[in-house]
UniProtKB/Swiss-Prot annotation:
Family the entry assigns: Belongs to the cytochrome b family.
Chief localisation class: mitochondrion
Higher taxonomy: Eukaryota, Rhodophyta, Florideophyceae, Rhodymeniophycidae, Gigartinales
Gene: MT-CYB
Keyword Mitochondrion belongs to the record: yes
Listed name of the protein: Cytochrome b
Sample GO molecular function, one term: metal ion binding
Further remarks about this protein from its record: Heme 1 (or BL or b562) is low-potential and absorbs at about 562 nm, and heme 2 (or BH or b566) is high-potential and absorbs at about 566 nm.
UniProt: heme b b566 binding residues: H95, H196
Listed SUPFAM superfamilies: a domain/subunit of cytochrome bc1 complex (Ubiquinol-cytochrome c reductase) (SSF81648), Transmembrane di-heme cytochromes (SSF81342)
Cofactor(s), by name: heme b
Length: 381
């Protein structure tokens, strides 16, 4: 066992082998492991794609087609990378919703939650700048629309936009800096993920019952490693269906048209995993108000440890909260649908109602429901 006591090996052993894990965690706890698999896949495929990609407005689109047609298994690398981004967001969104359901944001794991929200923000930034790189119509116009939102910042907004673009429009300088940042950001996400894991293991994992128990725990290996690998096999099958049978179903057909600044697409939409936030942005007619609401929709998650008022972690014992939780999930799905629809009625009104409920849930319902539950428990109602 002297081998295990070596510094690097002991870290791996403490966090992945002998790590004490609650015996009652189920497959909802698989998604942290799956998100790390997605990140590794994205980094590896991204490195190989970068070897053949050219970050120049005249060559970017052609270099992507070169990867698809001429590079050995280039089509596979690209489809794994593009669909891998979607899989990454699916896994992370489920991971977040699981945390909301089982109260993973409640102390002592509140800093784990805050770091997780930071990872989500970094993922959104990375995915956005990555969407620009193929230099199709949706890449160019999506970049133009989203970066233009910064101009809503009073006094300095226009200067920041010019600085982001590296000129007076989305052009070669923009593409170069986006490529550079897109290559760097996954490694930043990996570093922050290690911090996320280290802080989690300081206080230990939660469990479906939401109780702290240092007695009913077993080592992570082999019990939960085997469970994680079973989840990974199911995930790979699901992932492979998209890669091999429907590789473009989650993309936009306009991005197979080379970027043309003289022709505006009929309907500019971001990737599907941004649609709920995009719907919140469009729900407010005022530009600065919409941008503030969109940013707040993400930032508010980081403040949940200080907003909630309940003493019960798990929703298994909170029937009243559970009802409002599932309404919130429905609103998120509705916002995702509305984000892909034209800006016209009734879509605008539906988006506004769903956006209002989203914020009411976090700002009003979370603290109020906790106090109502406390009152009902005290009087045994």
């Amino acid at each position: 066992m002297r081998f295990i006591k070596r510094p690097l090996i002991s870290i791996v052993n403490d966090h992945l082998i002998d790590y004490p894990t609650p015996i009652n965690i189920h497959y909802a706890w698989n998604f942290g492991f799956l998100s790390s698999i997605c990140l590794i896949v994205q980094i590896l495929t991204g490195i190989f794609l970068a070897m053949h990609y050219t970050p120049h407005v005249d060559l970017a689109f052609a270099s992507v087609e070169h990867i698809m047609r001429d590079v050995n298994y280039g089509w596979l690398l690209r489809y794994i990378h593009t669909n891998g981004a979607s899989m990454f967001f699916i896994v992370v969104y489920i991971h977040i919703f699981r945390g909301l359901y089982f109260g993973s944001y409640i102390k002592p794991r509140h800093w784990v939650w805050v770091i997780g929200v930071l990872i989500l923000l970094l993922m959104i930034l990375t995915a956005f700048i990555g969407y620009v790189l193929p230099w199709g119509q949706m890449s160019l116009w999506g970049a133009t629309v989203i970066t233009n939102l910064v101009s809503a910042v009073p006094f300095i907004g226009d200067s920041i936009v010019t600085w982001l673009w590296g000129g007076f429009s989305v052009d070669n300088a923009t593409l170069n800096r986006f490529f550079s940042l897109h290559y760097l950001m996954p490694f930043v996400i990996a570093a922050v993920s290690l911090v996320h894991l280290a802080i989690l293991h300081q206080d230990g994992s939660g469990n479906p019952l939401g109780i702290d128990s240092n007695v009913d725990k077993v080592s992570m290996f082999p019990y939960f490693i085997v469970k994680d690998f079973l989840g990974m096999v199911i995930f790979i099958i699901f992932f492979s269906i998209f890669v091999y049978f429907s590789p473009n179903v989650l993309g936009h057909p306009d991005n197979y048209i080379e970027a043309n600044p003289m022709v505006t697409p009929a309907h500019i939409v971001p990737e599907w995993y941004f649609l709920p936030f995009y719907a919140i942005l469009r729900s407010i007619p005022h530009k600065l108000g919409g941008v503030t609401a969109m940013i707040s929709a993400i930032a508010i998650l980081a403040f949940l440890p200080w907003i909630h008022s309940t003493e019960i972690r798990s929703s298994r014992f909170r029937p009243l909260y559970r009802l409002f939780y599932w309404v919130m999930i429905s609103c998120c799905l509705i916002l995702g649908w509305i984000g892909g629809m034209p800006v016209e009625n009734p879509y605008v009104i539906i988006g506004q109602i769903a956006s209002i409920y989203y914020f009411i849930y976090f700002i009003i319902l979370l603290p109020v429901l906790g106090r109502i539950e406390k009152f009902l428990l005290e009087f045994k109602i």
